[in-house]
């Protein structure tokens, strides 16, 4: 594997499939990905365009805070993660089920 492929797979971790992401995909042509915690909007845009061969319009990224959880009366927390909402240009699409 060359270094550019490693960088792409280092930025994009996995697609996030949920009711909200499915609805956004159908209505607004927006796809949701879990990305690396140090990934920028430009990194995500370049990775999606090169991996799926599509044109990206807008990228929005946000940090999801980890939840506090308890297990057998011991406190703990889940780690936080970063996700990206990627809007494609009209006429473009990604088959998320095949890419998983």
Swiss-Prot record:
Output the Pfam families linked to this UniProt entry.
Ribosomal_L23
Q: Which UniProt keywords apply?
A: Ribonucleoprotein, Ribosomal protein, RNA-binding, rRNA-binding
Provide a GO biological process annotation: translation
Q: Which GO terms describe its cellular component?
A: ribonucleoprotein complex; ribosome
Q: Which InterPro entries does UniProt cross-reference here?
A: Nucleotide-bd_a/b_plait_sf, Ribosomal_uL23-like, Ribosomal_uL23/eL15/eS24_sf
Q: Which domain of life is it from?
A: Bacteria
Functional description taken from the UniProt entry: One of the early assembly proteins it binds 23S rRNA. One of the proteins that surrounds the polypeptide exit tunnel on the outside of the ribosome. Forms the main docking site for trigger factor binding to the ribosome.
Q: What is the protein name given in its UniProt record?
A: Large ribosomal subunit protein uL23
Gene encoding the protein: rplW
